[in-house]
């Protein structure tokens, strides 16, 4: 892709329609702050890779958005989320000469190369993300009668959110000659969800039944033992009388 000086490009316009008909597959997407499967999942890895190449080439970023949730394939503060209609990556050729952006992919790896006149860029750029803070998740509580009263189940453990400020450092002849803020990013925390039980304790009822069953068995056993003793006593008495009767005769 060639850009003349001053040309502005929209990532979404270049990609076009995201659908099965245009070759996109199902993968993980973030919708309303939640992870789910959708057509075109993973497209943000492409926009993020391009974004980092643009920053390192010191091209002008017109529009960029971070993801609503933390992602794990690049440093936080260096991602570029896209979503047709409300999130785009736009950039401009702010050099004095045409530039060419090349894309190389082999099925496992994607590379972007920005080619231009070396006279426009006689320095290097470094990307420096800086974490400003950690935001703890709030706690949401729901109730369920399918869980015994007094018990609490953690339905979702929750995740921290983060705020970042990202800088670019311009390095010339081994020295930092400029440090400039290029973006701010905020990643929303994911709530911790607890389910509090309001139902009856089935375990307690089971224990009562077990105890009643035990008592019944114990009583029955005791009765049998008593009957056995009475029977033995009666037999002993009978044998004793019989023996005495024989002796007398």
Each model region followed by its residue ranges:
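Well-ordered beta-sheet/strand-loop patches within structured domains
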Residues: 1-249
